[in-house]
Amino acid sequence: MKVFISHHKNDSELASKIHFQLRMQNVDAYLDVFDNALVSDSKLLTEHLKDLVRNSSDILVVMSESTRTSWWVPFEIGIAANQDLPTVTYLQDYVSLPEYLDYWPRLKSMNDIPKYVKARNERMQEVRKNLDSSVEMFSRRISSTEQFYSRLKAAL
């Protein structure tokens, strides 16, 4: 699990606390505050952010009144939505959300972060279990096909 934390620069302190809480839960998280590779060139920055979001498993959006003036937060959400990344919002002071963000789960305190991580880990385990089951079925299908080939070759 790797979480991209999207936030307005005015919310960097809260985003850092969220980053710390995720790390305490053994979750890899990206926060631009700790990124020495950030550049001021808008084209390079855009590509850098796109790569970071693409290489994340989730996006956590810090929502505050400042977010309403952000250009980058909606951009990052758009990249994540395009990839169908699981998205959660962290509401600062119960800010009212734009309608398009109302769909995703809302974290309202630091106590919600372990709940988010637990739910996400449980879902990832289910997906892994289903994948293992699919691989096993595929393997059985192959071995069944191989058995068919062997029988047919013997009969021919």
Q: Where on the chain are the PLM-derived regions?
A:
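Conserved N-terminal substructure of TIR/SEFIR domains
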Residues: 1-56, 140-156
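Conserved TIR/SEFIR loop-to-helix hotspot centered on a Trp-containing motif
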Residues: 65-83
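Arginine/glycine-rich "motif VI" loop of SF2 helicases in the C-terminal RecA-like domain
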Residues: 24, 28, 78-93
